[in-house]
Amino acid sequence: MPEPAKSAPAPKKGSKKAVTKAQKKDGKKRKRSCKESYSIYVYKVLKQVHPDTGISSKAMGIMNSFVNDIFERIAGEASRLAHYNKRSTITSREIQTAVRLLLPGELAKHAVSEGTKAVTKYTSSK
């Protein structure tokens, strides 16, 4: 009986030959997809508040995570409010109510006033 054909030995774990760069058929490197984050906006606000202060990449990651978390909470609460009131659109009113429900006391007041200011600025620029 003939023996089964043996395949070529697998490359060793530390082998450098196994590592190849991702390339398209025409030989050009593939562009990495951008990971969306709020880092440029966090940095702009930091420079407005403390112009001479920097931020580490670890701290920026934490800030990005924080902004994503707050965004999801507000969006979820606004969605629930729209659903309760049998509305299919989330308006600035739902966002404002969601902010009042989620943020404590003085922080909610400041957030609402800043949000109102931003919406006014946007509508006047149209």
Curated annotation (Swiss-Prot):
Q: Where is this region: Disordered?
A: 1-32
N6,N6-dimethyllysine modifications at: 58
Covalent cross-link Glycyl lysine isopeptide (Lys-Gly) (interchain with G-Cter in SUMO2), where: 6, 21
PTM summary from the entry reads:
Monoubiquitination at Lys-35 (H2BK34Ub) by the MSL1/MSL2 dimer is required for histone H3 'Lys-4' (H3K4me) and 'Lys-79' (H3K79me) methylation and transcription activation at specific gene loci, such as HOXA9 and MEIS1 loci. Similarly, monoubiquitination at Lys-121 (H2BK120Ub) by the RNF20/40 complex gives a specific tag for epigenetic transcriptional activation and is also prerequisite for histone H3 'Lys-4' and 'Lys-79' methylation. It also functions cooperatively with the FACT dimer to stimulate elongation by RNA polymerase II. Phosphorylated on Ser-15 (H2BS14ph) by STK4/MST1 during apoptosis; which facilitates apoptotic chromatin condensation. Also phosphorylated on Ser-15 in response to DNA double strand breaks (DSBs), and in correlation with somatic hypermutation and immunoglobulin class-switch recombination. Phosphorylation at Ser-37 (H2BS36ph) by AMPK in response to stress promotes transcription.
Residues with the modification N6-methylated lysine, per the entry, are 117
**Localisation:** Nucleus; Chromosome
The biased composition feature labelled Low complexity covers: 1-12
Q: Which residues carry this modification: ADP-ribosyl glutamic acid?
A: 3
GO BP annotations listed: defense response to bacterium
Where in this protein does the record say N6-butyryllysine is found?
6, 21
User: Residues where PolyADP-ribosyl glutamic acid occurs?
Assistant: 36
Instruction: List the keywords (alphabetical).
Output: Acetylation, ADP-ribosylation, Antibiotic, Antimicrobial, Chromosome, DNA-binding, Glycoprotein, Hydroxylation, Isopeptide bond, Methylation, Nucleosome core, Nucleus, Phosphoprotein, Ubl conjugation
Gene3D superfamilies tied to this protein: Histone, subunit A
Q: List residues, modification N6-glutaryllysine.
A: 17, 35, 44, 47, 109, 117, 121
Residue numbers carrying Dimethylated arginine: 80
Query: What's this protein's family per the entry?
Result: Belongs to the histone H2B family.
Quote the protein name from its UniProt record.
Answer: Histone H2B type 2-E
Tell me the organism: Pongo abelii
Name of encoding gene: H2BC21
